[in-house]
């Protein structure tokens, strides 16, 4: 199946602690159906001191399931479903079903 959400896409969180917030996809993990989104699903990690790193509590992004994400419409920034269509020149592109705008290329 083709990827509806890709690295670099602007997405909106549909469910969970960060519902309604948006961010940029940093990484997609297709085998796990999860994605890493900048500024979303922040967790605190307690780091023990090592020779290379100081001890402390660090905040970082955790992965979020793809079913809890929707692509942001390029026109208005709201959540939209994604469709695929083939253009006249033969390229297969993603488009926002809400507005009909082409997302890539």
From Swiss-Prot:
- Keyword rRNA-binding part of the UniProt annotation: yes
Q: Which GO terms describe its cellular component?
A: ribonucleoprotein complex; ribosome
Q: Which domain of life is it from?
A: Bacteria
One Gene Ontology BP term is: translation
Task: Give the matching Pfam families.
Answer: KOW, ribosomal_L24
| Molecular function GO labels | rRNA binding; structural constituent of ribosome
Q: Per the database entry, which stretches of residues form a coiled coil?
A: none
Primary role: One of two assembly initiator proteins, it binds directly to the 5'-end of the 23S rRNA, where it nucleates assembly of the 50S subunit.
Subunit record text: Part of the 50S ribosomal subunit.
What PANTHER family has UniProt attached to this entry?
MITOCHONDRIAL RIBOSOMAL PROTEIN L24 (PTHR12903)
Q: What is the protein name given in its UniProt record?
A: Large ribosomal subunit protein uL24
Origin organism of this chain? Beijerinckia indica subsp. indica (strain ATCC 9039 / DSM 1715 / NCIMB 8712)
